[in-house]
Amino acid sequence: MQLNPSEISELIRAKIQNLPSATEARTTGTVISVTDGVIRIHGLKDAMQGEMLEFPGGTYGLALNLERDSVGAVVLGEYEHISEGDEVKCTGRILEVPVGPELVGRVVNALGQPIDGKGPIQAKASSPVEKVAPGVIARKSVDQPLQTGLKGIDAMIPIGRGQRELIIGDRQTGKTAVALDAIINQKGSGVICIYVAIGQKASSIANVVRKLEEHGAMDHTIIVAASASETAALQYIAPYSGCAMGEYFRDTGRDSLIVYDDLSKQAVAYRQISLLLRRPPGREAYPGDVFYLHSRLLERAARVNAEYVEKLTNGEVKGQTGSLTALPIIETQAGDVSAFVPTNVISITDGQIFLETDLFNAGIRPAVNAGISVSRVGGAAQTNVIKKLGGGIRLALAQYRELAAFAQFASDLDEATRKQLSHGEIVTELMKQKQFSTLKVSEMAMTLYGVTKGYYEGIPVKTALKFESDFLSNIKANHAELLADIEKSGKLSDENDKKLAQAYESFKAGYNFA
């Protein structure tokens, strides 16, 4: 069979016309070096800051340093298979994580992938991990309480929905315990909780999951885990991923609470990445933008107004405000709150709960130091009954600590000082609370009423907690309607005041303190 030249040209023309025309212009680069998960790439002229880069084997990275002739990136995951000379592609996308109610009750990694063995998550929406915080006009003042269920915190350092309250203290002072109690106490309140574990042991994270499951709190909780065995990049990204998940609920007119446990480890991971990227080190070898690292994260926690929610939901949700409350945790070294990262986060947040080693070791748990703990905006959000009854608690504790220091050297004390010391001892004892035994507002009000009205005067300090527990049981059995009324209204009416006074008097008169 012979073909003449005209037939050959016809065949070639037909082939060219039928070729698929879907071409894709992609910028590619070459890996120059791999150092502990930080990769330097030659080329990629069009790469954007924070853009996802595609490595061989379906691995992705994040472009962080854009230099004249190279790009510095971190790998999100395993990097052992990446070697010098590998081809890298730009994706034109920024890092996104799945968000929505489908994640509730699940344990995910920093990229939103499930790690609890319960199958894939069919999330209908996704969100960028880095987002601009709501502006001034979109925000609403904090005026709704977020109850932690802990007497010492709800009475002295109240937290409002949309607030950022720092939990700070040395290791082993009960920081995580306070945060977990706050999560457990949101059961039935409609608040969705996100617990972000950064740089912790995998066994510790498993223990947290088990405790939350035992207390029925996983039904309203998402856990984002970036354990100590994960790369520095994933530990750096985890808080932003968790925040994006919490923002979904805030922006759809719901309330959410996020715990970052802890941001000290995130700062260390970011320092590691920055030093490997050869960014100039500053104080304590942290990079110059470590303040911005935390400020851009914590500014995303806010209470937003109904107009903002309506706009973001395209009119589906009307007349509802949303909030994201943040409880960042910072670990100090030997109680040094003047170190670089602690001072940064203190200045960003709306107050701090300072937990002290000495108090913890003395059996005062939660080990809250009332003197330097503060809530800058929570007072406006405090429940009326707690505000009314708990006003003197903080002052009593602060005065007691001051007097107790002087009383050690004084042999003869006047009556007023002795009275103040005994009152302070009782208050200190009553602020103790076991872990996972959170109280409702009405139950808390019973104790605060007794302290404020002097019904605990003359009671032996050792029996104060037993008296409190027995009185609560008595009230639940005989005056359940009183508790229900206070719980519903959040106020103590004159009628209920009289009933409560009578209940205390009759119970105390017949109580055996032996």
Swiss-Prot record:
Residues carrying the site annotation Required for activity: 373
Subcellular location: Cell inner membrane
Residues binding ATP: 169-176
Sorted UniProt keywords: ATP synthesis, ATP-binding, Cell inner membrane, Cell membrane, CF(1), Hydrogen ion transport, Ion transport, Membrane, Nucleotide-binding, Translocase, Transport
GO annotation, cellular component aspect: plasma membrane; proton-transporting ATP synthase complex
Membrane topology category: Peripheral membrane protein
Pfam families noted in UniProt: ATP-synt_ab (PF00006), ATP-synt_ab_C (PF00306), ATP-synt_ab_N (PF02874)
Catalysed reactions, as listed in the record: ATP + H2O + 4 H(+)(in) = ADP + phosphate + 5 H(+)(out)
Recorded GO MF terms: ADP binding; ATP binding; proton-transporting ATP synthase activity, rotational mechanism
EC numbers: 7.1.2.2
HAMAP family: ATP_synth_alpha_bact
Function: Produces ATP from ADP in the presence of a proton gradient across the membrane. The alpha chain is a regulatory subunit.
Protein family per UniProt: Belongs to the ATPase alpha/beta chains family.
UniProt cross-references to PANTHER family, sorted A to Z: ATP SYNTHASE SUBUNIT ALPHA, MITOCHONDRIAL
UniProt subunit comment: F-type ATPases have 2 components, CF(1) - the catalytic core - and CF(0) - the membrane proton channel. CF(1) has five subunits: alpha(3), beta(3), gamma(1), delta(1), epsilon(1). CF(0) has three main subunits: a(1), b(2) and c(9-12). The alpha and beta chains form an alternating ring which encloses part of the gamma chain. CF(1) is attached to CF(0) by a central stalk formed by the gamma and epsilon chains, while a peripheral stalk is formed by the delta and b chains.
NCBIfam families xref list: atpA, PRK13343.1
Protein name: ATP synthase subunit alpha
Species per Swiss-Prot/TrEMBL record: Laribacter hongkongensis (strain HLHK9)
Gene symbol of the encoding locus: atpA
